[in-house]
Amino acid sequence: MKTVSTAVVLAAAAVSLTGCATESSRSLEVEKVASYNTQYHGVRTPISVGTFDNRSSFQKGIFSDGEDRLGSQAKTILVTHLQQTNRFNVLNRTNLNALKQESGISGKAHNLKGADYVVTGDVTEFGRRDVGDHQLFGILGRGKSQIAYAKVALNIVNVNTSEIVYSAQGAGEYALSNREIIGFGGTSGYDATLNGKVLDLAIREAVNSLVQAVDNGAWQPNR
């Protein structure tokens, strides 16, 4: 009888534990360029975004499938940050077929606007590394950091002359750390989101540099 009672208690405990799953969510603030929501009284220059290629050695090993995911991700980030600067009219060239189809459905002429400049970009450096340390040969604890680094280059090309009229670069580093002390503490696996975070940071820095050039006259788009 005692054995049966113990089994019932254990079963009830197991059910209660399996029923304690929790779900949580929270919104996160998204980093924006420095000029976001700032006043600007100048002319907003029409620009489009051209190619954005991964020129680094990242994801280019013998097992790579040849698809430039890093460059594609970088281009999406660049378009967003350029639009948020309030200094340019960013023209979408990625979805021309869909836009043409919708204009045909609505019966309106597809009247595209031309760009004065094309922005091209390259991921010139990108890398990931793990850094670890031990305290008293690991007895007192150990730590590990995942570090991602990125550097990008932007070139502004005049569509009429093919002249590169201005260039900007940006670089950034992101780190994720965790520490275990005498057997206590969390461990973290490979975090793929660091790639996007550090890429966003580097591109944002390059775009901020571009905006500064417009504001201080180092690059005058309308001349």
From Swiss-Prot:
Membrane-related topology note: Lipid-anchor
InterPro entries in the record: Curli_assmbl/transp-comp_CsgG
Signal peptide bounds: 1-19
Coiled coil: none
Lipid addition sites, N-palmitoyl cysteine: 20
Subcellular localization(s) per the UniProt record: Cell membrane
A GO CC annotation given for this chain: plasma membrane
Lipid-substituted positions (S-diacylglycerol cysteine): 20
Keyword vocabulary terms for this entry: Cell membrane, Lipoprotein, Membrane, Palmitate, Signal
One Pfam assignment: CsgG
Additional observations: Present in outer membrane vesicle formulations which are used as vaccines in human.
Protein name: Putative lipoprotein NMB1126/NMB1164
